[in-house]
């Protein structure tokens, strides 16, 4: 197969993919069906932290009252 023929086949594949994807996007109204059908109890409504109501997490106590010391920066190009 020559280069011209391969390019023509490539264009046909791109065109066919575009034509197939346009109607499916209209049918879904531009939204992701998976997100719309997600069970509400699986979506977290509050942010849980290690100092909140999750006692099983491994969290240092200094994170609860913001007294943790910052880690020293490593030497390197990005830290100038």
From Swiss-Prot:
PTM description: Contains 3 disulfide bonds.
Sites of 4-hydroxyproline modification: 40, 55, 60-61, 70, 72
GO cellular component: extracellular region
GO molecular function terms noted in the UniProt entry: acetylcholine receptor inhibitor activity; sodium channel regulator activity; toxin activity
Protein name per Swiss-Prot or TrEMBL: Conotoxin SmIVB
Residues making up the signal peptide according to the UniProt record: 1-21
Domain notes: The cysteine framework is IV (CC-C-C-C-C).
Cysteine disulfide links: none
Protein purpose: Neurotoxin with probable activity on sodium channel. Induces intense repetitive firing of the frog neuromuscular junction, leading to a tetanic contracture in muscle fiber (spastic paralysis). In vivo, shows the same effect as the whole venom when injected on fish prey.
Keywords noted in UniProt: Amidation, Disulfide bond, Glycoprotein, Hydroxylation, Ion channel impairing toxin, Neurotoxin, Pyrrolidone carboxylic acid, Secreted, Signal, Toxin, Voltage-gated sodium channel impairing toxin
One Pfam family hit: Toxin_8
Keyword presence, Disulfide bond: yes
Tissue distribution: Expressed by the venom duct.
Glycosylation sites: 45
Residue numbers covered by the propeptide annotation in the UniProt entry: 22-38, 76-80
Cell location: Secreted
């Amino acid at each position: 197969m020559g280069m011209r023929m391969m390019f023509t086949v490539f264009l046909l594949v791109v065109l066919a993919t575009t034509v197939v994807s346009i109607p499916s996007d209209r049918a879904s109204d531009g939204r992701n069906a998976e997100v719309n059908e997600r069970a509400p109890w699986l979506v977290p409504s509050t942010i849980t932290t290690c100092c909140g109501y999750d006692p099983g997490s491994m969290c240092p106590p200094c994170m609860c009252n913001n007294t943790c010391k910052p880690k020293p920066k490593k030497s390197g190009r990005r830290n100038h």
